[in-house]
Each structure stands twice: as structure tokens, then as C-alpha cells.
């Protein structure tokens, strides 16, 4: 099986790169080993929320110089400010064309409400999620937080107690209530099945839609806004938008414990677009080994194609970090298993020195979280000290940064994905 590009990994980085290439007529295949981290995400995308010294970031452009000084191995610094800003704008345009229904701008971060009632700085958020500007107040002063009876992944009272502590909500009267929704009674018999995805699947056929509308109206009372767990609408926001229109209430949804519908919706929309453009998905498959010819990757073999090699002009490593086995740790080393790429080494972290992997304080940023492969400004992967000509890395498999600590995981994913896509398109156009 031969393609122009083979992408290993079907998360936000792999799908963004793949559909961008397919739009330009470059034949792509994505090897998809199952659920991606996107399925467990809040649906919001971070560009850069904090600097390594702990300072809060309001504007990416204004904070870039400080990032470059404090974290010279960060992928943003390797790519360069102008490239990153260009790819950010490119993704914002792409998100609109995909109808991802995101709000926000790279000019300035905003704050989103978390399921525990905190406020977290971010770049883009689903327009159904409650957000506030960095200095602003929430636009409604009377809010009801609605839980679902028997659903333990969303606790409205805990949310209310924490939300009141934020200055942006100090002017609000916040109350709580619960929806019963009789359609869900059979799920309540087994708490393991009473999850957001199961709830959405039961409700999506709208068999008792009017009853649900009436129950929400009654539970909200005279309030102008209500927060609900994100359990309404599996494929997109159309079900939730129908609820808003039918109730006449400003409804907002908050991410729940994983799996998260907000992330699942985005994953499905990206994947649907990729396949609609003619992209090939190797679902339930896993890349196991690779073969090189000179300074190029010649072929890879997968779990379902052990005898028949998968070949391509270019290979893109989008396999993620430890969560998705894009990186593996053993007692003596951390390594990238498919190509055995070089791993980033910093002052605080060495992949072959186990004592450098962790901080003594549990709550501190952990050095191992900055593990990943070495890239250059073109996102080419380094192996044995040399850049591999036709192998690129994108997303969480790249090293030199801690996406959790800095709040930049999604931004790194989409900027590197678009950078690699543009590189390959340019190479194909010149041939």
C-alpha cells in the first residue's frame, strides 16, 4: 500500500495535518489506534496560558520573547514567532470552515469556566461553554446550575461553591437544581453506564424532547441562564442549540469527567472532514516497526499488516505522548518506539537518567512531561544526531515543553501540524 503521506496518529494534530493535505490533493492515510486524547479534553484549545516562571499569559505575541528566553527548546521557539502566528491564524480560519463553533482569538486569551467552578485561561472555546474576558464579568446575574439525578460526573453544588469565589461571578445569584429526565431511568440502574456518552445516545432521538424542554424551564424558574453538564448532542451542537431555542433560556454546557462530549464532537467533525476529502483511515491499527533506506524512512509495518508494508513519500509522527504510547518509559530510559528518534535533553531532564524524570514535590511540574522527540524548524525528526529527510513530528510527541504546565498542548499540535502540511505541499508543488 503506497500513499503520498502516512500519518501515525489520529488526534487533533494528525487529523489537522491530514485534512489540510487532502484539501490540496495530497493522498494521505492515517493509522488510528483508537481513542485520542481529544476524546477526553474539555473542548477548549490552549495556545499559551503560562510561562515557565509561572507568569500568566494574556497575549501570546506579547509573551513570546519571554517564552523564548525561558524555554529555548519549546516548539514555538524552534518554529519562530512569525511562523507560529501565521499557523494560528490559519487554524482559526480552518476551524470556521469546519463549523467547530469556537470563540476566542490569538490576540488575547479568555477564561472558561471549568466543571469544578474555576476559571482557566485559554485560546479557543466552544461557543456553548461559559466564558468571560480577562477583565470582564459574566453577562448574567442570575444563574441556575442544573445537574442530572444520579449522574455523579457533574456536581452542581460543588460548582456553585467554587464559582462564587471568582470576582467575575461575584455579582451573580447562583442556585442549583436537578433534572430527572425519565428517559434515563434504565441507565441509573448501573452507574457505570450512566456517563455523558450514554446519556447523549439515549436523548439524541428526541423521543421526549418537549418533556425535556418543559423540565428545564421548570427547573430554571425565573433565572436567565443555566449551566448543564455536556450530555446533550453526540455528533455536534445541533441538539443543544435546539434546546436553547425551545426553552428561550441562555443555556451553557460544561465538560464532565471523561469521556467528554465537547472533545468527541471535535474529533468526529475533523475525522468526518478528512474522510470526506478522500483520506484513508487504518482504524484499530497500530504502527509496530519501521525500515530505513539511507536517511529516509522507506516503509512501516502495522499490527494488521505485518507482511504487507505501508510505504509513502513522507511520514508524519503524530502518535502523542505517554497517554497514547507515542512515548514509552522503561526503567532505564524514555524512548519513541517506532523510529527510535532522538529524545530532547534539557538542563532538568535526561531520558537516560531516571532521577531527572521527576520532581520531589508531587505538585510541581514534572520534568518527564517535557520528554519527546527532537525536531528542527521544519519539524523534521532527528535520529542519531541527523535530521531524517522524509520524517516529521507534530503534536505531543515533540519534546522540549510541558503542555500541562504551560497550557499550550493544543496550540503546539495545530501549529506544527499546519507547518508540516505546508512543507509537504510545497515539496509536492515543486516536483
Curated annotation (Swiss-Prot):
Pathway listed: Polyol metabolism; glycerol degradation via glycerol kinase pathway; glycerone phosphate from sn-glycerol 3-phosphate (anaerobic route): step 1/1
Gene Ontology biological process terms in this record: glycerol catabolic process
Name the UniProt record assigns to this protein: Anaerobic glycerol-3-phosphate dehydrogenase subunit B
Keyword Oxidoreductase: yes
KW Flavoprotein (keyword) present: yes
This protein's UniProt keywords: Flavoprotein, FMN, Oxidoreductase
Species annotation: Mannheimia succiniciproducens (strain KCTC 0769BP / MBEL55E)
Gene Ontology CC, one term: glycerol-3-phosphate dehydrogenase (FAD) complex
InterPro entries, A to Z: FAD-dep_OxRdtase_2_FAD-bd, FAD-oxidoreductase_2, FAD/NAD-bd_sf, G3P_DH_GlpB_su
Catalysed reactions, as listed in the record: a quinone + sn-glycerol 3-phosphate = dihydroxyacetone phosphate + a quinol
Subunit note: Composed of a catalytic GlpA/B dimer and of membrane bound GlpC.
Pfam families: FAD_binding_2
Amino acid at each position: 500500500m503506497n500513499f503520498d503521506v502516512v500519518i501515525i496518529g489520529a488526534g487533533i494534530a494528525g487529523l489537522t495535518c491530514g485534512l489540510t493535505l487532502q484539501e490540496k490533493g495530497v493522498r494521505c492515510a492515517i493509522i488510528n489506534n483508537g481513542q485520542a486524547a481529544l476524546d477526553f479534553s474539555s473542548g477548549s484549545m490552549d495556545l499559551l496560558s503560562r510561562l515557565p516562571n509561572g507568569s500568566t499569559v494574556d497575549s501570546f505575541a506579547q509573551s513570546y520573547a519571554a517564552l523564548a528566553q525561558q524555554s529555548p527548546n519549546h516548539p514555538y521557539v524552534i518554529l519562530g514567532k512569525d511562523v507560529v502566528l501565521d499557523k494560528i491564524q490559519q487554524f482559526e480560519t480552518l476551524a470556521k470552515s469546519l463549523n467547530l463553533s469556537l470563540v476566542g482569538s490569538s490576540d488575547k486569551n479568555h477564561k472558561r469556566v471549568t466543571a469544578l467552578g474555576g476559571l482557566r485561561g485559554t485560546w479557543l472555546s466552544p461557543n456553548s461553554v461559559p466564558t468571560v474576558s480577562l477583565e470582564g464579568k459574566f453577562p448574567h446575574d442570575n444563574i441556575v446550575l442544573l445537574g442530572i439525578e444520579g449522574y455523579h460526573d457533574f456536581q452542581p453544588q460543588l460548582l456553585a461553591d467554587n464559582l462564587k469565589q471568582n470576582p467575575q461571578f461575584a455579582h451573580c445569584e447562583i442556585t442549583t437544581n436537578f433534572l430527572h429526565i425519565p428517559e434515563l431511568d434504565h441507565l441509573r440502574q448501573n452507574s457505570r453506564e450512566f456517563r455523558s456518552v450514554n446519556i447523549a445516545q439515549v436523548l439524541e432521538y428526541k423521543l421526549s424532547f418537549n418533556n425535556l424542554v418543559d423540565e428545564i424551564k421548570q427547573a430554571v424558574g425565573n433565572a436567565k441562564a443555566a449551566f448543564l453538564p455536556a450530555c446533550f448532542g453526540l455528533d455536534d451542537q445541533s441538539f443543544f442549540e435546539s434546546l436553547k431555542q425551545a426553552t428561550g433560556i441562555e443555556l451553557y454546557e460544561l465538560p464532565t469527567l471523561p469521556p467528554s462530549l465537547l472533545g468527541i464532537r471535535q474529533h468526529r467533525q475533523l475525522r468526518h472532514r478528512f474522510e470526506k476529502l478522500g483520506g484513508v483511515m487504518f482504524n484499530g491499527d497500530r504502527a509496530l516497526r519501521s525500515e530505513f533506506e539511507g536517511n529516509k524512512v522507506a516503509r512501516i509495518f502495522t499490527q494488521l499488516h505485518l507482511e504487507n508494508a505501508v510505504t509513502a513519500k513522507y511520514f508524519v509522527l503524530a502518535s502523542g505522548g505517554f497517554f497514547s504510547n507515542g512515548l514509552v518509559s522503561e526503567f532505564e530510559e524514555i524512548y519513541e518506539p517506532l523510529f527510535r528518534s532522538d529524545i530532547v535533553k534539557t538542563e532538568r531532564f535526561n531520558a537516560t537518567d531516571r532521577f531527572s524524570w521527576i520532581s520531589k514535590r508531587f505538585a510541581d511540574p514534572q520534568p518527564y512531561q517535557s520528554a519527546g522527540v527532537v525536531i528542527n524548524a521544519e519539524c523534521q525528526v532527528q535520529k542519531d544526531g541527523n535530521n531524517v529527510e522524509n520524517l516529521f513530528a507534530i503534536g505531543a510527541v515533540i519534546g522540549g515543553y510541558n503542555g500541562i504546565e504551560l497550557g499550550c498542548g493544543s496550540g503546539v499540535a495545530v501549529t506544527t501540524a499546519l507547518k508540516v502540511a505546508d512543507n509537504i505541499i510545497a515539496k509536492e508543488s515543486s516536483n
